[in-house]
UniProtKB/Swiss-Prot annotation:
GO biological process, any: urea cycle
Protein name per Swiss-Prot or TrEMBL: Argininosuccinate synthase
Uppermost EC category: ligase
InterPro entries assigned: Arginosuc_syn_C, Arginosuc_syn_N, Arginosuc_synth, Arginosuc_synth_CS, Arginosuc_synth_type_1_subfam, AS_cat/multimer_dom_body, Rossmann-like_a/b/a_fold
Subunit structure: Homotetramer.
Annotated compartments: Cytoplasm
EC number: 6.3.4.5
Organism field: Idiomarina loihiensis (strain ATCC BAA-735 / DSM 15497 / L2-TR)
Molecular function GO labels: argininosuccinate synthase activity; ATP binding
Gene Ontology CC annotation, any one: cytoplasm
Principal location listed in the UniProt entry: cytoplasm
Sorted UniProt keywords: Amino-acid biosynthesis, Arginine biosynthesis, ATP-binding, Cytoplasm, Ligase, Nucleotide-binding
Pathway: Amino-acid biosynthesis; L-arginine biosynthesis; L-arginine from L-ornithine and carbamoyl phosphate: step 2/3
Length: 403
């Protein structure tokens, strides 16, 4: 093992990272400092985490509140790009990794650590995301990934490892779901979900109401958008984190934001995930409604390309890269006119933009009307159609001439 004196571990208080603390001490002979990122996963997840870390053998535990920064500097910029991975996934886990890695590096610098560690498995995307961020922010620090080194390969073996060392752990050996939560979403993987023929039961979902059990009466919300950012809900000005929290509560009550997908992982395999993103689903619907009004056809096409590019780079862990800065700058320029108000209808799992307006709207009722108008000469369409269809006309004529 390399000569490591002090390592900062991205610690959650779960089974894996509880076992990693003593494993690092035993195998590297180093001091272990636990770092916990509060990205809005909830008080229940954070309760007693410092005591757990020290009981596992950590010399210190730093709990860093990142909730506001996460939503303001990571969620909101991503929303401006319209990024949705493979057309469905709103990237909740991927969005949180850069800020967690950044804060972990900051703690490492603060305590004088010479290494970083995480509890990501060797099969998943997160190992790549974390370590790509480490490489960009702290190339001088060694990275230790226990799941790629140790021989512990199951929940049972991890529990046994902790029991042998008299380290308390509340986890059980029962096969349960792997979950990841933050202010934006919660993900569910594993268990019977690994069979894509198995429909998720209600015990899977923890954040949203069942659409069937949601209120029988729809609820309407008015969202205010300024330059691609949601700044108010029902005319009440709120911070980004507050906007998301309010929308999470309301949308979750109506069963909005559930998706069940099989996605292509960065490491080459497919995986199935169930995601709950209630407030984020409402936010995305509102911003898309504004884009419909203010972006011309070519700009919307360009925005679609940017959205796909940003979704891929974010999913792949390329936040701290020139590519991210370039795509973000392009998306930001398209948001210059993305301001207005959207009324959304929430009802039994669905969210629909039913009213929208913008001072920069390119929609003109005078031009679009099916009734009589004085601004559009329909005869002008004939010349346009002849030019637009000219390539098809030439090809057809040549085909006729060749017999």
């Amino acid at each position: 093992m390399s000569n490591v004196k002090k390592v900062v571990l991205a610690y959650s208080g779960g089974l894996d990272t509880s076992a990693i603390v003593p494993w690092l001490k035993e195998n590297y002979g180093c001091e272990v400092v636990a770092f916990v990122a509060d990205v809005g996963q909830g008080a229940e997840e954070l309760e007693g985490v410092e005591e757990k870390a020290k009981a596992s053998g950590a010399s210190e535990c730093h709990v860093v509140d990142l909730k506001d920064e996460f939503v303001k500097n990571y969620v909101y910029p991503t929303l401006k790009t319209g990024a949705i991975y493979e057309g469905t996934y709103l990237l909740g886990t991927a969005m949180a990794r850069p800020i967690i890695a950044k804060a972990q590096v900051e703690v490492a610098r603060k305590v004088g650590a010479d290494a970083l560690s995480h509890g990501c498995t060797g099969k998943g995307n997160d190992q790549v995301r974390f370590e790509s961020c480490y490489a960009a922010l702290a190339p001088d620090l060694q990275v230790i990934a226990p799941w790629r080194e140790w021989e512990l390969s199951s929940r049972e073996s991890l529990l046994g490892y902790l029991a042998e060392r008299n380290i308390p752990c509340s986890a059980s050996a029962t096969k349960i779901y792997s979950r990841d939560a933050n202010a934006w979403h919660i993900s569910h993987e594993g268990g019977e979900l690994e069979d894509p023929w198995c429909e998720p039961t209600e015990k899977v979902w923890t954040m949203t109401a069942s659409p069937e059990q949601a209120p029988d009466k729809p609820e309407y919300l008015c969202v205010t958008v300024e330059n691609g950012e949601i700044v108010a809900v029902n005319n009440q000005a709120l911070s980004p984190f507050e906007c998301l929290s309010v929308l999470n509560d309301v949308a979750a009550k109506h069963g909005v934001g559930r998706v069940d997908i099989v996605e292509n992982r960065l490491v080459g395999m497919k995986s199935r995930g169930c995601y709950e993103t209630p407030g984020g689903t409402v936010m995305m619907a509102a911003l898309q409604a504004i884009d419909e009004l203010v972006l011309d056809k070519v700009s919307r096409s360009w925005k679609t390309q940017l959205s796909e590019q940003f979704a891929q780079l974010l999913y792949d862990g390329r936040w701290f890269t020139p590519l991210q800065q370039s795509v973000m700058a392009a998306a930001q320029s398209l948001c210059a006119t993305a301001s207005g108000e959207v009324v959304l209808k929430l009802y039994k799992g669905s969210v629909t933009a039913v009213q929208k307006r913008s001072p920069h709207s390119l929609y003109s009722e005078d031009f679009a009307t099916f009734g009589a108008d004085e601004v559009y000469n329909q005869a002008h369409a004939e010349g346009f159609i002849r030019l637009f269809s000219l390539p098809s006309r030439i090809a057809a004529l040549q085909k006729q001439q060749k017999g």
